[in-house]
Swiss-Prot record:
GO terms for cellular component: cytoplasm. Transmembrane segments: none annotated. Directs the termination of nascent peptide synthesis (translation) in response to the termination codons UAA, UAG and UGA. Modulates plant growth and development. Belongs to the eukaryotic release factor 1 family. It comes from Brassica oleracea var. botrytis (Cauliflower). InterPro entries: eFR1_2_sf, eRF1_1_Pelota, eRF1_1_sf, eRF1_2, eRF1_3, Peptide_chain-rel_eRF1/aRF1, Ribosomal_eL30-like_sf. SUPFAM superfamilies: L30e-like, N-terminal domain of eukaryotic peptide chain release factor subunit 1, ERF1, Translational machinery components. This is Eukaryotic peptide chain release factor subunit 1-1. SMART domains: eRF1_1. GO terms for molecular function: translation release factor activity. Pfam families: eRF1_1 (PF03463), eRF1_2 (PF03464), eRF1_3 (PF03465). Keywords: Cytoplasm, Growth regulation, Protein biosynthesis.
Length: 434
């Protein structure tokens, strides 16, 4: 799994979270809201037949209003299913029905999509709300973690993903024991012992690169690494120059275990369970910690605030874009009703309520397009060539980033003089006012 795949997954997970939120908030009158989930390898014909049977049953509902809305929902589900010859490889999720919006008006909605990973649930429910419990399975982490269990008898390389553990490779080693005798030869024995130890650490480091670095992307194929073992081999490995720096950056924990081999692997998993459960939290702290470090060292390789960040994105300077996952800012494309010019504005709830933001020189600005800035960034980040990371405000660092930096910022590839953008804008404003 390269970084690119990781970014895509971040965006997919954010989209599902957003969808769950809006589906959970939706309410309807009567039981006119259908939740339908089909796992991979299910048959479209089976569900079509079931919906036909449901239609027959619903025709007997006594209340005319309720009957019509239920039949309407079943019909729109049938229509949408006609677009699929077969169930997509990851399954199919369909929500359809009549919801009541904030103004009390009824509105028909239909949402259908193939999840970004297989969904193993079958669901059909007709209710006054959409059922999203099954979608939570898509949010569960399927991150893969690497384990290196190293002691005086040999090394084991393994991975853990969810509850599935796999042994990739193990090898034994015969290291000479410390000698009490030897007289003149004691130094020679010590030197041989050190040499064999050194070779053992080197072999382990080389195999670690072989098993945990994806040759296609040159990036680690695991989300984190746990080094385990008895004695100090694991520490020696983590501090060794021979250990690949790309993997060293992924070390989450170094643990002491009483055994080597598979028993040690099981023990290491047990001892690391808390860290693995909080890995998203740890990654977030590290990411924002790196961002704060750029600021405290005043490297000039950072940017914060919506406008500065977007300017830096435009110039291709942003390496990692960091955004709060609940950022409540909309991107407006506005058209001057008199001159026909378009402007883009980014407004929060408070600014949206101020009509002055929709005027320029007493001319009204018409809304051509309105979109959540988060959604726009998720769709466009590929074009800017940057990695997009969503953060929460649950960690101390995350909370500080959201409160102090407006929830939008970036780590830059190179220094950028942000004042140059302001000067360009000033020149532009002067031209406007003349």
């Amino acid at each position: 799994m390269g970084d690119n795949h990781g970014d895509d997954k971040n965006i997919e997970i954010w989209k599902i979270k957003k969808l769950i939120k809006s589906l959970e908030a939706a309410r309807g009158n009567g039981t006119s809201m259908i939740s339908l989930i089909m796992p991979p390898r299910d048959q479209v014909s089976r569900v079509t037949k079931m919906l036909g049977d449901e239609y027959g049953t619903a025709s007997n509902i006594k209340s005319r209003v309720n009957r019509q809305s239920v039949l309407g929902a079943i019909t729109s589900a049938q229509q949408r299913l006609k677009l699929y010859n077969r169930v997509p490889p990851n399954g199919l999720v369909l929500y359809t029905g009549t919801i009541v919006n904030d103004e009390g008006k009824e509105k028909k909605v239909t949402i259908d999509f193939e999840p970004f990973k297989p969904i193993n649930n079958t669901l059909y429910l007709c209710d006054n709300k959409f059922h999203t419990e099954a979608l939570n399975e898509l949010l569960e982490s399927d991150d893969k973690f690497g384990f290196i269990v190293m002691d005086g008898n040999g090394t084991l390389f393994g991975t853990l993903s969810g509850n599935t553990r796999e042994v990739l490779h193990k090898f034994s080693v015969d290291l000479p024991k410390k000698h009490g005798r030897g007289g003149q030869s004691a130094l020679r024995f010590a030197r041989l012992r050190m040499e064999k130890r050194h070779n053992y650490v080197r072999k382990t480091a080389e195999l670690a690169t072989q098993y945990y670095i994806n040759p296609a992307t040159s990036q680690p194929n695991v989300s984190g690494l746990i080094l385990a073992g008895s004695a100090d081999f694991k520490t020696e490995l983590s501090q060794s120059d021979m250990f690949d720096p790309r993997l060293a950056a992924k070390i989450l924990n170094v643990v002491d275990v009483s055994y080597g081999g598979e028993n040690g692997f099981n023990q290491a998993i047990e001892l690391s369970s808390e860290i693995l459960a909080n890995v998203k939290f740890i990654q977030e702290k590290r990411l924002i910690g790196k961002y704060f470090e750029e600021i405290s060292q005043d490297t000039g390789k950072y940017v914060f605030g919506v406008e500065d960040t977007l300017n830096a994105l435009d110039s291709g300077a942003v390496e990692t874009l960091i955004v709060w996952e609940n950022l409540d800012i909309n991107r407006y494309v506005l058209k001057n009703s008199t001159t026909g010019e378009t402007v883009i504005k980014h407004l929060n709830k408070e600014q949206e309520a101020n009509t002055e933001n929709f005027k320029v020189d007493n001319n009204d600005l018409d809304v051509e397009d309105k979109m959540s800035l988060l959604e726009w960034l998720a769709n466009e980040c590929k074009r800017f060539g940057c990695a997009l990371e969503f953060v929460t405000n649950k960690s101390q660092e995350g909370s500080q980033f959201c409160r102090g930096f407006g929830g939008v910022g970036g780590i830059l590839r190179y220094q950028l003089d942000m004042t140059a953008f302001d000067e360009d804008l000033d020149v532009y404003d002067d031209d406007e006012s003349e």
